[in-house]
Amino acid sequence: MLDTAGKAEAHAPPRARAWRGLDAVIGNRIALAGLVIIAGQIAAAALAPLLLSHAPDAIDYRAMLQGPSEAHLLGTDELGRDILSRLLSGARLSLSVSTMAVTLAVVLGLPLGLVSGYLGGWPDEILMRLLDSLMALPPLVLALTIAAVLGPGLFNAMIAIAIVSVPTFTRLVRGQVLSLKHNDYVTAAYSVGTPTWRVLFRHILPNAMNPVIVQATLGIGFAIITESSLSFIGLGAQPPTSTWGSMVQVGFQYLELAPWYVMAPAAMMFLAVLGFNMLADGLHDALDPLARTG
């Protein structure tokens, strides 16, 4: 009974599934808490120029490494710049770069997974072996290697993160296509003369998107950590650009004198990753019909 209900919901129109999924996310406390954390960080970063009186790059040598005060709520850095302003400025970059990296990985991984899963045979075998070779190294080590080859810079870090993430989405979509391409509604579409490209993008891809959405949400959290790690070792954001990772990298040198310098961006990274993981957990429950009906 439950299995039948789950299958019926899985084959429901995408728009109907989206609305039911949204209702389920709102009703899931963990997912809602994650969404609130993420929305709060995005809102704070977007409104920072309107709410804060200090520019992120404004230097004041008379206020170097000052602790939190009324004038500087989170203190100042080694050049007297307001840490709160730089923290929120860095939030815009860290969140946007991570989101764009995952978006690029999805854009590249979706068609590769579709073609690989649909064609099968030697094209699928060759692609899977190539992806296996990429996944042989730990993701962070592979991202570091690619970023080192491309050179330091935020754009190159984004490309490195995207390349590392592509195999995950390709294999995920491929697995979904393999399980969906022999379903009755796909066979029925072929029987009435529907072109292959339309079957793929109209009947198979929409039904394969739920795990992709969950993985993309998790992937943003991974991208934040990876971008911060690359910036920490000098392969990401370059001065005077501030991201959470670059702030931790510089602040680590003043850990004993100004512990707040490191704690603020580290806390923001922790909250962001926690928020995306909580949201992904809730999305999994919301978008998986078998999980919800069970």
Task: Tell me what each language-model feature is.
Residues 1-110, 114-115, 121-122, 193, ...:
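Gly/Trp-centered helix-boundary motif
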Residues 73, 77, 107-109, 114-118, ...:
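Generic hydrophobic transmembrane alpha-helix motif, especially the helices
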Residues 24-25, 64, 86-90, 94, ...:
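Amphipathic alpha-helical segments that mediate coupling or scaffolding at interfaces
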Residues 35, 92, 96-100, 142, ...:
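Internal alpha-helical transmembrane segments of multi-pass membrane proteins, especially GPCRs
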Residues 19, 81-96, 100, 120-128, ...:
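Amphipathic cytosolic juxtamembrane alpha-helices at the membrane-cytosol interface
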Residues 135, 146-149, 161, 176-177, ...:
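Glycine-rich helix-loop "coupling/hinge" segments at transmembrane-helix boundaries
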Residues 41, 114, 143-148, 157, ...:
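Transmembrane alpha-helix boundary and packing residues in multipass membrane permease domains
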Residues 48-56, 117-121, 146-152, 164, ...:
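Short helix-capping/hinge motifs at transmembrane helix termini and TM-loop junctions
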